[in-house]
């Protein structure tokens, strides 16, 4: 690489071409293979000793959801924020850092101290961080989920929106990053505020909305079901929108729907994309599946059908 503003393998790959890039990788590997840095079984075993299984108790699996069906807030949290565990009687709990009014992934020092204490009480002293900008208590006994939920609520860490529209991935953007072409956090704030209705979000279902302030793509916009990329046009901030991106075993790069938008237009753009999805989806179909079945044409048509008012410019920092 020769440009710190474009420090990504994808940019180097495009510049060199697949064949030349592959040739150089293979040449480098031939030089390194069987060298002094080769991982031996002895070294593997040494490191593995630090990752022994926890002292799990012998427990029976509990149908917590069935026993708490009448408690809708808790049931919603169980549905979105609690995941199955390979050990009977345990669950993995995601702590949402996506409460409306808070920058995606942000936590205060007090919240982090609180989570550290919870980890000691509920999860063998272990906390994990996800690339979706949330936290995980990976080993919680199912019988203690209700108690944990109540404690998380007291610190604003129990928003039941994991995997939903407001579980936004966003880079710091122009407010905090010198490489950014545009702000990301005010866009995330405006979208979260516009769709701050958990019933609506649960109806929309699984959807990944990712925002990056520049082509370095720290917000993974290119693999978001809806991706937003900040771009610079003659010193002004604009936002390019793509749909159909996906991560995981069915990974895909999103396709750009058309010309970019100003910051004040973005919540309405997202609204029109969701309207198209609701009108076109079949039962049980996720947003990304609808895009995969129909392509971007119906989404593009609806978004650009009528002009979107420019509105007021985004504030310097919606979270200040």
Feature names for model-found ranges:
Residues 1-320:
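Peripheral terminal and linker regions in Fe-S/redox and tRNA-modifying enzymes
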């Amino acid at each position: 690489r020769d440009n710190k503003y474009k420090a990504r393998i994808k940019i180097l790959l495009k510049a060199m071409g697949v064949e030349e890039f592959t040739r150089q990788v293979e040449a480098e590997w031939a030089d390194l293979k069987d060298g002094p840095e080769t991982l031996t079984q002895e070294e593997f075993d040494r490191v593995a000793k630090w990752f022994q299984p926890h002292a799990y108790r012998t427990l029976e699996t509990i149908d917590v959801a069935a026993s708490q069906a009448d408690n809708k807030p808790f049931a919603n949290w169980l549905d979105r924020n609690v995941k199955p565990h390979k050990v009977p009687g345990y669950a993995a709990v995601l702590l949402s850092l996506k409460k409306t009014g808070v920058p995606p992934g942000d936590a205060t020092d007090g919240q982090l101290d609180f989570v550290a204490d919870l980890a000691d009480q509920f999860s063998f002293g272990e906390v994990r961080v996800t690339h979706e900008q949330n936290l995980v208590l990976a080993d919680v006994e199912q019988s203690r989920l209700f108690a944990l939920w109540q404690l998380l609520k007291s610190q604003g860490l129990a928003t039941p929106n994991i995997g939903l529209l407001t579980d936004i991935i966003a880079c710091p953007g122009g407010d905090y990053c010198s490489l950014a072409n545009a702000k990301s956090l005010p866009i995330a704030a405006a979208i979260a505020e516009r769709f701050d209705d958990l019933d609506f979000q649960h109806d929309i279902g699984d959807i990944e909305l990712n925002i990056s302030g520049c082509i370095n793509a720290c917000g993974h916009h290119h693999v978001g079901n809806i991706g937003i990329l900040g771009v610079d046009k003659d010193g002004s901030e604009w936002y390019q929108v793509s749909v159909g991106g996906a991560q995981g075993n069915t990974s895909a790069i999103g396709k750009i729907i058309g010309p970019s938008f100003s910051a004040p237009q973005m919540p309405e753009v997202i609204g029109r994309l969701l309207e198209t999805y609701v009108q076109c989806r079949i039962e049980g179909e996720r947003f990304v599946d609808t895009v995969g079945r129909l392509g971007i044409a119906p989404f593009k048509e609806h978004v650009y059908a009528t002009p979107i008012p420019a509105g007021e410019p985004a504030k310097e920092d919606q979270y200040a």
